[in-house]
């Protein structure tokens, strides 16, 4: 049992207590509070899936690739530790949304998009999430690059001003932080993995076909994806 716990901690499960042994009990006022958080999370999730052009494109792409996403099956609003906002559990093909750490719709939209990119990678490629840190690094680079995490507006809210090539710097930094949060590896190992795959993964824009720097970009990308899908269907 102790070996299993160590293994789960090394894979980042300590950040998602409800993913582990499930021995946390919710009682009294805490239970009511968690119900409120969960309800709000579910409402914001539905809005994200119905209205976010980023999420809508990814859902279409997943369906096109043969991995249709179902809200009740593939998303789970849960309590998380620390400041983590979400995660993709490759073992269950579920996206975890941290109901205690996501309070605004714009934040929910970004988290859903970020984790759907991981789910898309899981669907289209043979990603060895648990044993190959380079595979994880590639998906984290893509998620940071394509989800809107590193738009100029979001960088300004983090008080990061005037950074040359801020987008690339942000993508590299956030990919590195994500790896260190969920894997028990040294910073040197994580940096090496990011550096080795950065160029190829940064330039892999599927299924968007471009870096969507705004909702407008994402809407155009979604339209282009739908037109491309219709074109191939008519061949």
Curated annotation (Swiss-Prot):
Active site: 115
Record EC number: 3.4.24.-
A GO BP entry: proteolysis
Positions with a binding annotation for a divalent metal cation: 114, 118
Top class in the EC scheme: hydrolase
Keywords tagged on the record: Hydrolase, Metal-binding, Metalloprotease, Protease
PROSITE patterns for the chain: ZINC_PROTEASE
InterPro entries in the record: Peptidase_M76_ATP23 (IPR019165)
Pfam families assigned to the protein according to its UniProt record, in alphabetical order: Peptidase_M76
GO molecular function list: metal ion binding; metalloendopeptidase activity
Protein family according to the UniProt entry: Belongs to the peptidase M76 family.
Entry-linked PANTHER family: MITOCHONDRIAL INNER MEMBRANE PROTEASE, MITOCHONDRIAL INNER MEMBRANE PROTEASE ATP23 HOMOLOG
Protein name: Mitochondrial inner membrane protease ATP23 homolog
Lineage, broadest ranks: Eukaryota, Metazoa, Chordata, Craniata, Vertebrata
């Amino acid at each position: 049992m102790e070996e299993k716990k160590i293994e789960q901690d090394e894979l980042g499960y300590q950040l998602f207590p409800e993913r582990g042994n499930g021995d946390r009990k919710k009682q009294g006022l805490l239970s009511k509070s968690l119900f409120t958080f969960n309800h709000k999370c579910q409402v914001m999730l539905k809005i994200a899936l119905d209205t976010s052009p980023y999420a809508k494109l990814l859902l279409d792409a997943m369906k096109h690739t043969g991995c249709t996403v179902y809200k009740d099956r593939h998303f789970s609003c849960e309590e998380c530790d620390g400041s983590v906002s979400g995660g993709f559990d490759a073992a269950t093909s579920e996206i975890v949304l941290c109901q205690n750490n996501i309070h605004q719709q714009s934040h929910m939209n970004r988290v859903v998009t970020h984790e759907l990119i991981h789910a898309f990678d899981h669907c289209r490629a043979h990603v060895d999430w648990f044993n190959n840190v380079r595979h994880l690094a590639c998906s984290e680079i893509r998620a940071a690059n394509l989800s809107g995490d590193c738009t100029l507006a979001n960088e300004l809210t983090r008080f990061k001003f005037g950074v040359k090539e801020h987008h690339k710097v942000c993508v590299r930094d956030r990919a590195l932080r994500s790896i260190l949060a969920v894997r028990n590896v040294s910073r040197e190992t994580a940096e090496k993995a990011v550096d080795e795959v950065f160029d190829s993964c940064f330039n892999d824009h599927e299924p968007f076909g471009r870096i969507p720097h705004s909702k407008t970009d994402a809407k155009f990308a979604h339209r282009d994806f739908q037109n491309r899908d219709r074109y191939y269907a008519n061949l």
